[in-house]
């Protein structure tokens, strides 16, 4: 049952009955105040702060305001003093008409928390109006045969004041024939009747003139007068008589104009002109004459303007039937106006709380009242809003409602709500009114900036100029205003050895990244760091993204020749036997490039040669080979210039210089060696002979094997000492130079040679070939394995 009651309170449609709804939002009872009408603007009614038990500052802090029906500003509330003051002169007659007492209902609306205080102000009447007759002159025709005691109706006066200030009685100037009586209608209005005291004599006095005075009960009293002119007529035996002394008729307020609502009828027993009857309104007010029209012949009473139940719900109309002799009869028509549903409901907005923070819970967004001028079911009202909105209507006090949010809102999903409040009455047909309220949702910093990518990869070519824009990061924030303003920063690198602050910087406003210095691919190929994005909300929210910077290689390094050495010392000389076949490997140029990729792809070509066409260079690996058979006519010494070029743009290059010496054979030394060299060679030869002799005479296989191994080990040790050459600095024709393999040739082509120049004989000698039968077998294998060997060379 409790859950059902909760659902009932949160229903979107609430039936409003114009009755007082007591609750926690309202005061326990209405406070009543009074003030006399016509008081000047600013007149003090009461001190609300004192009456409500609040401090003046609290009254202002809670946004106290006065709410009146129809949103009329009759009052003003001073937040400085807490006084309730008149905002304008109040005219009781204008506000309430004849209704007494005259009560103005108003509410004091307090917020934080929401509270209604119901109040009422009674407007006390002052005697500011005099009685007024509808006709300043009345003309009566009375037969001289009229009997004393006959009552003759007179036109009444009206006084807009009420109570004792209203019209109280009538008087007439003293005379011997008439006196006046004061009568009261059912609605309390007073009217006069003229009573004949003494028979009239036309021959003695054919006309009389009297003054009728209307007096109110004010202090001092006010009065109004009308002149009565009486004409004494000859005898007319019968006066007209109505079929009914009272007609009652109910008329719908939407009855069309010129509709006949009632027909009165009178008869006269006389004949001739004395029996001819005409009908007329008897001392009717201006409002009656504007609303109805009476046919003087037929007695049909028609509407001449639309009725309005909400303004006047009944009329009392006096009708006079007069014959040709001046005699008359009187009847009364009471018109009851029947309410129809012709007024749509009205909404009066008291306050709107907009914008509201998106993280606020159940919050009062608006306070409004509804009303309908109709009565009964026509004035009962039902309120509703759309079902798909996070709001509901909550009835408070009397005819007031509050529009309340169901909970926290999400500005990023929807920042503005146009709420249509539909008010429908229960009449037939039902009338409805729609009222739109716009509620704005203000932003709360509940969204952190979000990068467009979780990681960014940037490419920067080395040797860039400092302050170069290398890329950008971007983050967006779904919030608005300052909560969505993003600033960027570099976060401390995870690698403590990375000098990030000297490598890159970031523009805090737009996320542009800049290189602070020229980058060197050979020193730093790549690095990564984190970038933070922080909004300006309170508290600030942030996020981060990873940035990888890849340095692209530029062709900024020339090839470097490792072999042959180009250090300006003794040049390297390669020996080539004259018996070498075409394609014989002379040497190999070895070079490296500090760049990477295609910038480090090297190609070789023979740039210059002493004898063109004799040697060629393999373009891809730098091998220098013979291009044809050698002959005795070929010079013994050759100088080659090999160009090493990379594949960069633009390409870079280096030049290697080779010296080649053609020799007849390797069996005899070409040049004399130092004295120590022959002795070493002979000792080595004797050792070999000794090993062979011992091996041949050995009778035991095991002993021979062991001895052979020992001799071989001894041979290798001595061969190492014999192979060393002294390499002094200086030009080629000088001391011995070591031109043993530098590691750039394959093991098959490694050898050692010692050369000397000067006064010795022009001979050379191979001290020790590392691999026996090198020349014959190596050249033969090259020629047989690759018949198109020559095609892979580049000749110059």
Curated annotation (Swiss-Prot):
Role summary: Potential calcium-dependent cell-adhesion protein. May be involved in the establishment and maintenance of specific neuronal connections in the brain.
Family annotation (SMART domains): CA
Name of protein: Protocadherin beta-3
Residues carrying covalently attached carbohydrate according to the record: 169, 418, 436, 567
GO MF annotation terms: calcium ion binding
Domain Cadherin: 35-133, 138-242, 247-347, 352-451, 456-561, 568-671
UniProt-listed PROSITE patterns: CADHERIN_1 (PS00232), CADHERIN_2 (PS50268)
One Gene Ontology cellular component: plasma membrane
Gene3D superfamilies according to UniProt: Cadherins
Topological region Extracellular: 27-690
One Pfam family hit: Cadherin_2
Membrane topology, from the record: Single-pass type I membrane protein
One BP term from GO: homophilic cell adhesion via plasma membrane adhesion molecules
Keywords linked to the UniProt accession: Calcium, Cell adhesion, Cell membrane, Glycoprotein, Membrane, Repeat, Signal, Transmembrane, Transmembrane helix
